[in-house]
A protein has these predicted regions:
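Sec-dependent N-terminal signal peptides
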Residues: 4-13
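Catalytic cores of nucleophile-dependent amide-cleaving enzymes
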Residues: 93-183
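Sec/Tat signal peptide C-region and signal peptidase I cleavage site
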Residues: 18-22
Length: 341
């Protein structure tokens, strides 16, 4: 049984006794001395390679003199922390959660240790199977939760599910990319533009920049310069980074003679497109099938299909609309910058 329900049950039983408490004592039971803390920040991940997103975010929030918790990298751990604080009569006005995220793989934060990444599907399943901590609504009913997760605000369904899990008064996330520790601003938002190519089969920056021009004809960005610039170098100018998305399936046949002969990439793509299971995955990703590098292999009676695409992400910092030479102020209350539910 959830602890918050136990507390309510005990209070009702005690107040239902034959000898009434004094009004002062009854008030003390119903209205405990609650401490309201302005905010807390959960750094829900750790830096890998040369990506310093988490350490930059930590430095930013330290300068804001906000309490920071590190080492809690799962939603279960964060909920347990909030529950424990609530049991000790501590509430938070704002909870900030810093976690990597992208439009295809969901949040990098896990549901539990060694568990699945946070997506709509994984959260719904965890709630259904009681594999996720339950939070007491009284602890977060008046709390605003802000997710600093790139592009999460585009995924209204996932943000809605997170609001349900945290039982929060309000949740917010930006559809744009969060950048901490920038050259010209310690925290700013940037609009992403995407392109794709089969991993290790790039046709070069000139060809790719032409694809960006065709896909975004009304966007005034020097695509060639952006694609060859890997970090923020000039004020307000676009730059880019890349990452890979792999897909893999295994199919076991009763008889190896029933296995299709996939001689080349075209044969693999034909077979993938005719499979409802694989076609559904690619449809959800919204990445063209020809943008994957396809490979097949056989292990006994098992056919293994692997695909991998490289995502090129061009980031354009969002500037003040009044023409000032400044990046747009990051205000969570600004609905033009944040999805607020």
């Amino acid at each position: 049984m959830n602890k918050c329900f136990i507390i309510v049950l005990v209070s009702v039983l005690m107040l239902g006794g034959k000898k009434p408490f004094s009004q002062q004592l009854e008030t003390a039971l119903v209205l405990p001395n609650i401490s309201i803390q302005e905010s807390i920040v959960f750094i829900a991940g750790f830096d890998e390679s040369d990506n310093t997103y988490y350490s930059n975010a930590k430095q930013y929030f330290q300068k804001q003199e906000m309490p920071i918790e590190e080492g809690l990298h799962t939603i279960n751990e964060i909920i347990a922390y909030i529950n424990n604080a609530g049991e000790n009569q501590v509430r938070f006005k704002e909870i900030h959660v810093v976690s990597h995220s992208n439009a295809w793989l969901g949040m990098s934060m896990r549901i539990k240790e060694n568990g699945e990444r946070i997506t709509v599907k994984s959260l719904e399943y965890a709630v259904k199977e009681y594999n996720i901590e339950s939070i007491c609504k009284e602890y977060t009913g008046n709390t605003k939760i802000i997710f600093h997760s790139c592009g999460l605000g585009e995924n209204k369904a996932l943000l809605t599910e997170l609001k349900h899990v945290f039982k929060a008064d309000q949740v917010s996330a930006s559809p744009y990319f969060n950048v901490f520790g920038g050259k010209y601003a310690e925290h700013y938002l940037a609009k992403p533009y995407y392109g794709y190519y089969p991993t290790a089969e790039s046709k070069g920056p000139a060809f790719l920049s032409q694809e960006f021009r065709e896909n975004y004809p009304n966007v005034h960005i020097d695509w060639l310069t952006a694609l060859t610039t890997r970090q923020e170098s000039s004020f307000g100018e676009a730059y880019s980074f890349k990452f890979n998305i792999p897909v893999e399936w295994e199919f076991t046949f009763d008889n190896s003679n029933d296995m299709p002969k996939l001689a080349d990439k075209e044969a693999i793509m034909d077979w993938v497109s005719e499979s409802p299971e694989m076609a559904e995955v690619l449809f959800a990703l919204q990445i063209p099938i020809e943008k994957f590098r396809w490979r097949s292999s056989v292990n006994g009676n098992t056919l293994i299909i692997k695909g991998k695409t490289t995502v090129l992400c061009v980031l354009a910092p969002i500037l003040q609309s009044n023409g000032a030479n400044e990046y747009q102020n990051v205000r969570v209350e600004d609905r033009s910058l944040y999805q607020i539910l």
